[in-house]
Amino acid sequence: MKKYFYFLSLLLLVVSCTSEDVTSNNKAFQALKDNVFWRAEFFQAGTETNGIFTVEGSLDYDQIRFQIPEPAEKTYVLGVDDDTKAVYKNTYKGKEAEFSTGTGKGNGEIMITEYNAIDNTISGTFKFTAVNADSDAEKQTIHFSEGVFYKIPVTPEHNFITTNN
């Protein structure tokens, strides 16, 4: 009888365990920021007035912004040119900082896994190391890994205002 009880307990334990999968959630933008979990509260995607496509996520004073030529389903390599780049900003007063990738600085990739023009959403993964714009700052690089953005709303027929990045 004990064997049956143990078997049923083990079976119940195995059946009740589930893995977390970001695709089971609605809309998400998250990553490990220097190995600490970071999840955006606000996110959006769309085309700026200069024609560049952007994906953005923000949490309080932190903002991540990706710039890609188009929302095509492919992998964009960072650190090669200024057309494709990742920017991280902290806008907290007194602790302002900006890190970015670009021609010959930083590295990483943005992989667009789905661009749904019918539902106006974009999904993908990312990882990057960005360089501080202030060469005299104590912290010179910031690292994002295991990044995912899922079903981020794409604003159709509305251009974002171009910012200086």
What are these regions (language model features)?
Residues 2-7:
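Sec-dependent signal peptide recognition
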Residues 18-21:
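Bacterial signal peptide processing site
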